[in-house]
Swiss-Prot record:
Pfam families: Cytochrom_C (PF00034). Keywords: Electron transport, Heme, Iron, Metal-binding, Transport. One of its GO terms (molecular function) is iron ion binding. Binds 1 heme c group covalently per subunit. This is Cytochrome c-551. Heme c binds at residues 12, 15-16, 61. It comes from the Bacteria. It comes from Azotobacter vinelandii.
Length: 82
């Protein structure tokens, strides 16, 4: 599956949009915040899989039922939005 397909089928759309903040940050905000950081796709993939909090406000992102490969595909796709 492509990143866009995973975004649509894995529940990401409930909290995230490409260019506007919903519950979580927009993908354009994520890309702007982390642009140029080495290894950021791996870091984001780990957050997608395990969940996390504290980076974008009080509401935590829950762990997501994705494989490591799916999480990496999603992270790489998220980071294409500028």
């Amino acid at each position: 599956e492509t990143g866009e397909e995973l975004y649509k089928t894995k529940g990401c759309t409930v909290c995230h949009a490409i260019d506007s903040k919903l519950v979580g940050p927009s993908f354009k905000e994520v890309t702007a915040k982390y642009a140029g950081q080495a290894g950021i796709a791996d870091t984001l993939a780990a957050k997608i899989k395990a969940g996390g909090s504290g980076n974008w406000g009080q509401i935590p992102m829950p762990p997501n039922p994705v494989s490591e490969a799916e999480a990496k595909t999603l992270a790489e796709w998220v980071l294409t939005h500028k």
